Amino acid sequence: MPRLRPRVRIPSSAHGDVAEWLRSGLQNRLHEFDSRRRLKEMIAITGSGEFLPGIKNADKSLFSTIDNPYVLTFSTAAGKESIERQEYWKNLAVNHFKSLGLRHKHIEAKNKNEIDDKHVIDEMSKANIVYFSGGNPQHLINSISTKNFMNELIRIKKIGILAGCSAGAMIMGEKMIKGTGLNFIKNSIIIPHYGESYYSWISNTVKLLNKGKYKLICLEKDTYFTIT
C-alpha cells in the first residue's frame, strides 16, 4: 500500500521554544497517510502547488483517508482577481479532482455575500472536505466569516478534512502577517512558499516571534503539514 509522509521544514530562524515546539509538539502528531486508516478530523496545509501534478499523489493518499469523500473547493482568496484568473482556478480544481476520481464541486464565491448564499451553505452541509486555494488571505478570511458558513466549516472540521494552500493555509493559524486567522492551529503563524520567495514575510514573522507567543510554521511546495 503506497504511503506518503508529509514533511515539515524547521527553518534556521526557528530556535529555542520555536524549534522545540515544532519538534516535540505538532511534529509528533504527523503521521503517514494510509488508505486503511479512517479519519474523523484533519487539517492539511501546503505551501504551494494546489491542484497541480506535483501534489496529485499526495492528494490521492490524503483524501483516501475519508469514507465517501465529497470535496468542495473555494478560490475565494482570489476573489478580487480577474475573471480569467477565476476561470483558471475553477478549471484547475475541476480537472484535478476529476483525475482523482473524487466527487467534487467548485464553489464560485468571490466575496462574503456569495459565500453566504443558500446554495453554498446547502453544499457545505453535504461535504466532508473543504479546500481553500491561494490568493489574498485577508480577503479570504473576511469573506468566510459569516455565521452560517463558519457553522458548517466547524462541522466539517470535526468529521472530515480542512485543507488549504498558500492563503488557504495561512488562515488556519492564530495570527497572520496582517490580521488574525481562524485559530485552528493555536499559537501559530503559517508561512507558505517557504524556500521560494516572500523572504520579507519570514523576517517580519521572526520579529513577531521575538515579541510574543506565536510559533512559525513554514510550508514548502507539494508537501502537507497535517494535524489530526
Predicted regions and their residues:
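Class I SAM-dependent methyltransferase SAM-binding "motif I" and its flanking Rossmann-like core
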Residues: 133, 139-145, 149-200
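C-terminal and late-domain segments of enzyme folds
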Residues: 42-67, 77-88, 96, 176, ...
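Serine residues within intrinsically disordered or low-complexity segments
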Residues: 12-13, 24, 35
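Short, positively charged low-complexity motifs
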Residues: 6-8, 19-20, 32-33
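N-terminal, intrinsically disordered charge-dense segments
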Residues: 1-4, 16-26
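General beta-strand structural signal in soluble alpha/beta enzymes
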Residues: 45, 105-106, 131-132, 162-165, ...
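Portal/gating segments that form or line small-molecule/metal binding sites
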Residues: 78-139
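Structural motif
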Residues: 70, 128-129, 161
